[in-house]
Amino acid sequence: MINPLSSAQLGKNMGKRMKFTGTKNYVATEDLTIAVNAAVTLERPLLIKGEPGTGKTELAKQVASGLGLEMLEWNIKSTTKAQQGLYEYDAVSRLRDSQLGEERVHDVANYIRKGKLWQAFEADKKVVLLIDEVDKADIEFPNDLLQELDKMEFHVYETGETVRAINRPIVIITSNNEKELPDAFLRR
């Protein structure tokens, strides 16, 4: 997702921005540091691919630690849908509550559970959002998140509101190379 920049190119863009240099418990290579800092500077997702157990998830944790940020982790499974990262609407509970005469039924927002992207978008401070093992999901999963990750916003159809990132999160996406990711996703 991010093409590494040279140290000189990255240095010009860093200014007073956050800069990851590793942590006392994690020594990052120069190439890895450049890739992370390019993603931070350009405010673009960083895709980390590699075999299981090679430290992809740990990198995200160390980036959060090194930059003094909270980390939100969205673990992807074969059944995960992109919509779950945004929000889930519980229509069944709302129907049940309407039959029971519950007052809360009048506000549809009472039946919306915020996903990890929504939580990251509304965080008061910048956070690191880890989307872990994206290749475990359906082949269309990554493409289903393209617009949300590009624009850092999404529409909640049930309430009519648009959720926009208050502070653009640092998005780190990991892949175990179990499946090929869509070209459109990789180009971004």
Give residue ranges: language-model regions.
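AAA+/SF3 P-loop NTPase mechanochemical coupling elements
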Residues: 111-112, 118-126, 156-175
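Conserved AAA+/SF3 P-loop NTPase catalytic/coupling segment centered on the Walker-B
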Residues: 114-116, 121-149, 180, 186-187
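Phosphate-binding P-loop
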Residues: 28-29, 37-43, 121-124
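Dynamic helix-loop-helix/coil hinge segments at AAA+ ATPase domain boundaries and subdomain interfaces
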Residues: 15-32
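A short helix-turn-beta junction within AAA+ P-loop NTPase domains corresponding to the substrate/partner-engaging
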Residues: 69-71, 183-188
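Walker A/P-loop
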Residues: 47-80, 91
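Conserved catalytic/switch belt of AAA+ P-loop NTPases
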Residues: 140-164
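Short glycine-rich substrate-engagement loop in P-loop NTPases that contacts/grips substrate
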Residues: 86, 91-124
